[in-house]
A protein has these predicted regions:
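Charged interaction scaffolds used for protein-protein
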Residues: 1-17, 28, 32-50, 61-109
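Intrinsically disordered, low-complexity regions enriched in acidic/Ser/Thr/Pro/Gln residues
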Residues: 56-58
């Protein structure tokens, strides 16, 4: 069964769109790189160009040479602009169902 999760983020760098998807695979790759989502959040808040590039590569499922060019593109685009978008993506990884998940009111007995 396929579900569209809350929090898919498109980031445009140097005319190329990177679609970051809130998947368990992305979470695992980011956690492996930063020791957890908190470490990734700290890298974004510290305006780490390489940290932002790693998150983009993990979220977009990039590997090898595709992933290697992302840091330069983040730097060219401006890390502040990129970090704002990545904060939204990381928030979605903490809660992939989104803010409206669940029932508005309790079920009646």
């Amino acid at each position: 069964m396929s579900k569209t999760l809350f929090g898919t983020v498109d980031i445009v760098l140097d005319g190329e769109t990177y679609t970051l998807k809130p998947t368990l695979g992305a979470v695992r790759a980011i956690e492996a790189s930063f020791g957890g989502l908190r470490g990734a959040s700290q890298a974004v808040n510290a305006l780490s160009i390489v940290g932002c590039a790693v998150i983009i590569a993990c979220g977009a499922g990039l590997t090898g040479k595709e992933a290697d060019v992302v840091a330069d593109k983040v730097w060219q685009a401006g890390v502040v602009e990129v970090s704002i978008q990545l904060n939204a993506y990381l928030t979605a990884l903490y809660n992939p169902k989104g803010p409206d998940a669940g029932k508005d009111q309790p079920a009646k007995a």
